[in-house]
A protein has these predicted regions:
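Short linear sequence elements within intrinsically disordered, low-complexity coil regions
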Residues: 22, 53-54, 81-82, 200, ...
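Polysaccharide-binding surfaces and accessory modules of carbohydrate-active proteins
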Residues: 268-338
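Flexible domain-boundary/linker segments
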Residues: 13-14, 20-21, 163, 195, ...
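Catalytic and substrate-binding regions of extracellular carbohydrate-active enzymes
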Residues: 38-39, 46-292
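Short, small-residue-biased leader/transition segments that mark boundaries at the very start
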Residues: 1, 5-9
Length: 339
């Protein structure tokens, strides 16, 4: 699955794209780097990854309580217990991340405005380059208030054996993306459909210590060629920080078929929450009506038939969506304005 150390978010949750499930960061690769450094006498590497491991896992290296049990024969083949140097202090998570990072080998880009566990914001963008990928175009996840607010659907409940994986979870409508004329798709699993990074601020970089390293504004602009409909798509995303505890996202998605004849460009967005209200931006009622327009029977992807409780309205006004995430302490209300 498309996960890695660089995908860590504030609560050490991994970013999700392709065949993933939401989960916490696995520190085994960090342990392997420490063991490699100890065997080969790489002191600088050992110090770097030991500090990282102690940052991610404060209990790392602490001796486990001895148990009065028989010694397993597997102990002859297991790795020796990891011993960490006590003089190496835990690093700070800010030392291992950057405001913007782009990994073209998997067509993945992340941008953030800090690492505060509650108030910082982050955007994750991905296309489909490599193995275990989905047909998702320029897909995104949004992070805020310490949660994955706009999650990627991942692999689904029944993994590869389920029909829902082939028809829905691996297809455009299950992702936060734009589907053209209801037909956007391409081969999944091993895929070679990446996006091009046109421009960004700040420049993509590995972590580097710097004063005021998180600017008040970050942005990225990427291009993707959707092969099924022969559409050119660009997505410009930005995080604007307005205060120590406040900020907002900007998402400008442009989509146009090369030869014209555009019918519809469906903007899909999935947010956490138990409730959602949809009104005009000025608060007036849109008079939503039930519809079955978005369905497989309309010559669209089968994934459209997985949508339920569908409603529609025709309007020339800006639209406002308010999601309610009910929490034990304080509810979260993501607001989205569609212009």
């Amino acid at each position: 699955a498309s996960r890695g150390l660089g995908d860590v978010y504030k609560r050490q949750m991994i970013c999700g794209f392709g065949d993933t499930h939401p989960n916490y960061l696995n520190t085994t690769p960090v342990v392997r780097m420490i063991e490699n450094a100890q065997v080969n006498g790489k002191e600088e590497q050992e110090r770097y990854f030991t500090a990282l491991l102690k940052c991610l896992d404060p209990d790392a290296g602490k001796a486990a309580a001895k148990k009065n049990v028989r010694v397993s024969i597997n102990s002859f083949f297991d790795d020796k217990p990891l011993t960490l140097k006590p003089d190496i202090r835990a690093g700070k998570i800010e030392d291992y991340v950057s405001p913007l990072f782009y990994a073209p080998n998997v067509s993945w880009l992340v941008q953030r405005n800090g690492m505060h566990p509650r108030h910082s914001l982050m955007i994750s963008l991905n296309a489909s380059e490599g193995n275990h990928m989905h047909a998702n175009g320029i897909s995104m996840e949004l992070y805020g208030k310490g949660y994955v607010l706009g999650p990627d659907a991942g692999i689904g409940l029944y993994l590869y054996s389920g029909l829902d994986y082939a028809e829905y979870y691996s297809q455009f409508p299950s992702h936060n993306t734009v589907c053209v004329d209801g037909i956007s798709s391409y081969p999944v699993m091993k895929s070679n459909h990446s996006f091009d990074l046109l421009s960004c601020f700040p420049a993509s970089s590995a972590a580097a210590a710097a004063k005021d390293k998180f600017p008040s504004v970050t942005y990225s602009d990427v291009y993707f060629r959707e092969p099924e409909s022969r559409a050119d798509q660009t997505r410009m995303m930005s995080i604007v920080t307005t205060g120590p505890e406040t900020g907002y996202y900007v998402d400008i998605f442009r989509s146009r078929k090369e030869r014209g004849g555009d019918k519809m460009h469906d903007y899909f967005y999935h947010n956490l929450g138990q409730e959602m209200t949809l009104t005009a931006a000025d608060g007036t009622d849109l008079h939503l009506q039930p519809t079955e327009e978005l369905a497989f029977a309309g010559a669209h992807l089968g994934a459209y038939s997985y949508l339920f409780d569908k409603k529609c309205a025709r309007t020339g006004k800006d639209v406002k969506a308010v999601f309610t995430i009910r929490m034990p302490d304080k509810d979260i209300h993501p607001n989205i304005i569609l212009i």
